[in-house]
Swiss-Prot record:
UniProtKB keywords: Cytoplasm, Elongation factor, GTP-binding, Hydrolase, Magnesium, Metal-binding, Nucleotide-binding, Phosphoprotein, Protein biosynthesis
Binding site for GTP: 19-26, 81-85, 136-139
Principal subcellular localisation of the protein: cytoplasm
GO CC annotation, single: cytosol
Alphabetical list of InterPro entries matching this protein: EF-Tu_GTP-bd, EF-Tu_GTPase, EFTu-like_2, EFTU_2, G_TR_CS, P-loop_NTPase, Small_GTP-bd, T_Tr_GTP-bd_dom
Subunit structure as annotated in this protein's UniProt entry: Monomer.
Protein name: Elongation factor Tu
Organism from which the protein derives: Pseudomonas aeruginosa (strain UCBPP-PA14)
Length: 397
């Protein structure tokens, strides 16, 4: 029987493998493509195709990432896998590959290791909402008590970082057996099928950008004589309709106004939607009341803040970053959406300096408020040159 043609009408979900080096992330990624293609259709990818991850640039940072896709009975998955630990750190902090959920791969023979912990912590910091666990290499463990012990350790670790460890699904299996098409004791092919069915049920379908509350970062402001002030930008999420109220948030005190027109390519429209570049005409707003770096948003959905905890990756010298470390009291610019704001960096206790190539948790205080929420990405710049990337982990004030 011929495979059915690829249908775009299944819901699309982004996932990725995380976990310690050599615990089997890439083998599992290959097994997922094979088992899904055999079970539900689609094409398989070989281990070495995935392992030679192409280099890509996100915000000027070089990251090696492999992208594969596979189908379950009800969904289409886009899956990212990184060859090295540093690639994970960069990927998660820059949001180059946003994950709706992560598959934590942990070797049943070794149990949780330092990167297992670090990837769970990173997932918490960057806002990965769901984790499903695959206890791999179960074919190398004969002792059921040992498996139980490792499972308990993983659950404890998840609880430590505010994931629901006791309720997290844990699938026990062998990615290598699944890849070889074997299924002794149900730990090969059927374990991977069970993993995919668990992704289907445990990770909720993400809310599409268009269904979220309206937000547009302002890129430019014009005044059109006789008509008023127009702000332009790309709608990040939601829909704006003519005659709807909007708030202008960030940098100055929040103000309210009404959208009296939407235009795109010089044509008037009834609405602007997520992903579109539009001009929005604002009623009674003066040219000098609005500036680049503010956002237009559905009233009450986003607030301006100045102080937050964040997870930051500092570019290495090879990536065009700093050549020297920085110390507490470092004051670079933080580039949010469309503008730079100066901020002061407070390092964690016991950390004296931060080297290029490090990732670090720190608290930043900006000199002007920016419309922000947890999970917002930013760049760190010095005089227009990017020296780091970060993500808001927790707003403080």
């Amino acid at each position: 029987m011929a495979k059915e043609k690829f249908e775009r009408n299944k819901p699309h979900v982004n996932v990725g493998t995380i976990g310690h080096v050599d615990h089997g992330k890439t083998t599992l990624t290959a097994a997922l493509t094979k088992v899904c293609s055999d079970t539900w259709g689609g094409s398989a990818r070989a281990f070495d195709q995935i392992d030679n991850a192409p280099e890509e640039k996100a915000r000027g940072i070089t990251i090696n990432t492999s992208h594969v896709e596979y189908d379950s009975a009800v969904r289409h998955y886009a899956h990212v896998d990184c060859p090295g630990h540093a690639d994970y750190v960069k990927n998660m902090i820059t949001g180059a590959a946003q994950m709706d959920g992560a598959i934590l791969v942990c070797s049943a023979a070794d149990g949780p290791m330092p990167q297992t912990r670090e990837h769970i912590l990173l997932s918490r910091q960057v806002g990965v909402p769901y984790i499903v666990v695959f206890l791999n290499k179960a074919d190398m463990v004969d002792d059921a008590e040992l498996l139980e012990l490792v499972e308990m350790e993983v659950r404890d670790l998840l609880n430590t970082y505010d994931f629901p460890g006791d309720d997290t699904p844990i699938i026990i299996g062998s990615a290598l057996m699944a890849l070889e098409g074997k299924d002794d004791n149900g730990i090969g092919v059927s374990a991977v099928q069970k993993l995919v069915e668990t992704l289907d049920s445990y990770i909720p379908e993400p809310v599409r950008a268009i269904d979220q509350p309206f937000l547009m970062p302002i890129e430019d402001v014009f005044s059109i004589s006789g008509r008023g002030t127009v702000v332009t930008g790309r709608v990040e999420r939601g829909i704006i309709k003519v005659q709807e109220e909007v708030e202008i948030v960030g940098i100055k005190a929040t103000t309210k106004t009404t959208c009296t027109g939407v235009e795109m390519f010089r044509k008037l429209l009834d609405e602007g939607r997520a992903g579109e570049n539009v001009g929005i005409l604002l009623r009674g707003t003066k040219r000098e009341d609005v500036e680049r770096g503010q956002v237009l948003a559905k009233p009450g959905t986003i607030k301006p803040h100045t102080k937050f905890e964040c997870e930051v990756y500092v570019l290495s010298k090879e990536e065009g970053g700093r050549h020297t470390p920085f110390f507490k009291g470092y004051r670079p610019q933080f580039y949010f959406r469309t503008t730079d704001v100066t901020g002061n960096c407070e390092l964690p206790e016991g950390v004296e300096m931060v080297m290029p190539g490090d990732n670090i948790k720190m608290v930043v205080t900006l000199i002007a408020p920016i419309a922000m929420e947890d999970g917002l990405r930013f760049a760190i710049r010095e005089g227009g040159r990017t020296v780091g990337a970060g993500v808001v982990a927790k707003i403080i004030e």
